Amino acid sequence: EDFVDQMDDQYFADEFNNIPTEIKPYDKKASIELIWENKVGDNDAHNLNLIFSQEFVIAASSDGSLQKMQMATGETVWEREIPEEIMIGVGGNFENILFITKNSYLWCLDSEGNAIWKIFIDGEVLTTPVINNKKVYVRLANYEILQIDLKQGDIDWKYIHSTPALAFNGTSSLTFSDGVIYGGFGAGKLVAVHQNSGAFIWEADISQIKGVTDIDRLTDVLSKPIINDAQVYAVSTSGDLTSVDRRSADIIWTRKISSFNDIAFDGFDIYLAHKSDSIYSLDSKKNGKTNWRNADLQYRRITNPIIIGNHIAVGDFDGYVHLLNLETGVVEGRAQISSDVPIGKNIHPIGNNKILGIDLEGNVFYMQVKNV
């Protein structure tokens, strides 16, 4: 059965006639209730992210609008207008709000939305800037990594890694652990560098390059690596999920599966969306063996999966949020939060039963999941 599933996803997922699967009836065992919704700006939100705490949410719109909201009620605390188009963000924290504008400037604002500094980034940025250990990290589309001083905005170091002539733009987020930065790169590489200096530590081949032409050989790691004790997991676009030893870079196990999305991990099982939008649960203790697969949402351009209580939650291109049982993969809940508007790539679990997200028109939504 697993072989048949892999054939369906791996070999038929590349067809040009990938029509989104129609919504199917299901046995409702969980409900999704909208707590509040708030619109940011007058323009779309591209695929912008947001930052949040227990008390507040900060989100942006591509027209330069920034908005701080109460987490409990959605009430607007303040609004700011930036005289540039916002392309990437929001990142950072509530003391240092980060985003990238269309003309390649990285901005840093304080908790009231006032500018602290901005610097020019020499290259395209496609991932949200992050703060770790009082430093700012920016990932460029050509896979370069920048460390920037949080107080002054000065560049401390730059890590440059060679990329193939033909590669996807670098969109994977970085993972930080024990003074090491892990990131996916072109040609199916997972790379580790020292956080303090940007010095290279090791690289591992997550996916084997196959084929003759550059297109045939195209394989990148576009998902955020996941840490599990002495292992790090990464998945490639061309068909491999791999567990790597963090000390030696040795391959512990690998299995065939492809994904462009970030993966979720609960300490035992790995949850990921195949590039066909089938959703898998894989046993990390058994070399990635399939626990279950759900193909009900194929080609619906789903978001990164998140774990919320005893469910997996994903959004899709039609504004739906779906709940799948964590143990079985069966759909148990669904709600159309944004009518005919795609949910942004990232939705976020808040505690065990709430979800925060933003759609591509800049509507921020806060929902509660209840078992029925």
Predicted regions and their residues:
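C-terminal closing repeat unit and adjoining cap/tail of repeat-based domains
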Residues: 316-362, 368-372
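Beta-propeller domains
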Residues: 61-72
